Amino acid sequence: MKKIVYLALFLGFALTNTSCNSGKKAQVINTFVKTYFPDTEVIANIKDGLDCDVTLSDYTQIGFDGNLFGKLEWDEVDCRHTSLSTTVPAALVPTEISNYVNRIHGSQSITKIAKDNRGWDIELSNGVEIEFDKRFNVIDFDD
């Protein structure tokens, strides 16, 4: 019982004492935005549990996945609703995925990318969605 109380206190402190607007999380977000979207600024920054959801001035949406140790890493970039028909920065797209898109869908650009522990999901400018496993094999294709 004592362990459960301590765990509940720890989790409660960890979840309430972290913010996306200050500290290390804000620094990670600001560095990411300045690096990959230098002509924009953050207009909304919403904390969702340990995660942070950010909207930029061009309406790009970025999801950051957090953990109990304060680490924050991007897990989704969505440029589909931007005011400037922006594509996902090439530096965020693994080479294997870029090569596949260029080879098979040459004239299309990547407008959304998401990653998790199973692999990667992308959406192209023509609306085609492609899912890759960790080894960058195509495992699902939805047009």
Residue ranges and their predicted role:
Residues D53-T82, N126-D143:
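Amphipathic N-proximal alpha-helical interface segments
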Residues E41-F64, T111-I130:
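Exposed beta-strand-loop-beta-strand "reactive/processing" segments of non-cytosolic proteins
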Residues K34, G66-N67, R103, R118, ...:
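Surface-exposed charge patches in extracellular/virion surface proteins
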Residues E41-V42, F69-L72, G106-A114, V138:
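A broad structural signal for short, well-ordered beta-strand segments within beta-sheet-rich domains
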Residues M1-V28, V33:
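Bacterial Sec-dependent N-terminal signal peptides
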Residues G12, K34-Y36, I46, N102-H105, ...:
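A generic structural signal for short, solvent-exposed coil/turn residues
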Residues S22-E41, S85-S109:
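Short, non-transmembrane alpha-helical segments in secretory-pathway proteins
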Residues K2, T16-T18, T31, F69-L72, ...:
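Hydrophobic transmembrane signal anchors and adjacent membrane-proximal interface regions, especially
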